[in-house]
């Protein structure tokens, strides 16, 4: 029997997982997993628990939004390479952009069924200053929308909450002076937005 640490963010997205949480856990147990559940207590809790408890488990699965997944990844990446566990993802956030890129269903039960049959595979992980990301790293206009949007708005409106918060950010548009080196070329200019994405959609908008 394999040991699973199941990290659950109860405040993610529209909190739809609570209606199927027991069914999701039942799927894991019936597929030979001994499940330990950790309910996140604050924004950084997923990162902390992933780092501190990895040695006790064979796999970590997180249920939440793209932010919850990012926190788990940041916790895992602080460990020596040999100690980093496979990470599974049950998407239940407001947009689930990264899950869409990996063709993971945004219905908890369907995602769990797919997860227990899946084989681990490698994904690209970005590194910016002291943070790691699998979804997106951005600066400038709209880049703080996901963090600035109140959680209660996301729970009620889902993707629409980001749209409303984005409209507010248009009022003040700062620019950033950058020197960019790529493909043996150098570009220098002022930019109002920049993004590195590991997803086919950002903020709920597809085909970026």
What residues fall within each predicted segment?
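Hydrophobic packing residues within well-ordered alpha-helices of enzyme cores
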Residues: 24, 46, 72, 98-99, ...
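ATP/NTP phosphate-donor binding region
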Residues: 1-63, 185
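Active-site glycine-centered loops adjacent to acidic/histidine catalytic or metal-binding residues
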Residues: 9, 66, 91
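Short amphipathic alpha-helical segments
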Residues: 18-20, 73-76, 100-102, 207-208
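Catalytic core of DAGKc-family lipid kinases
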Residues: 31, 40, 79-196
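Short Gly/Thr/Asp-enriched flexible loops that form oxyanion-binding sites at enzyme active sites
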Residues: 68-81
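Internal helical hairpin/lid segments
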Residues: 195-208
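Short, glycine/serine-rich, charged loops/turns that create anion-binding
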Residues: 11-12, 94, 200-201
């Amino acid at each position: 029997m394999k040991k699973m640490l199941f990290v659950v963010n109860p405040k993610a997205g529209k909190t739809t997982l609570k209606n199927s949480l027991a069914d999701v856990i039942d799927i894991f147990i019936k597929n030979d997993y001994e499940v330990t559940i950790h309910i996140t207590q604050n924004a950084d809790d997923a990162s902390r628990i992933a780092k501190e408890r990895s040695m006790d488990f064979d796999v970590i699965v997180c249920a939440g939004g793209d932010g919850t997944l990012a926190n788990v990844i940041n916790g895992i990446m602080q460990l020596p390479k040999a100690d980093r566990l496979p990470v599974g993802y049950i998407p239940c956030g407001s947009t689930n952009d990264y899950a869409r890129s990996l063709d993971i269903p945004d219905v908890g039960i369907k995602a769990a069924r797919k997860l227990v049959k899946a084989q681990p595979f490698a994904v690209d992980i970005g590194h910016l200053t002291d943070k790691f990301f699998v979804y997106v790293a951005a600066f400038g206009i709209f880049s703080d929308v996901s963090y600035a949007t109140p959680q209660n708005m996301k729970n009620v409106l889902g993707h629409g909450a980001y749209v409303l918060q984005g409209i507010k950010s248009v009022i003040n548009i700062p620019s950033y002076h950058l020197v960019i080196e790529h493909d043996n070329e150098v570009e220098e200019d002022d930019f109002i937005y920049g993004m590195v994405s590991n997803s086919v959609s950002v903020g709920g908008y597809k085909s970026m």
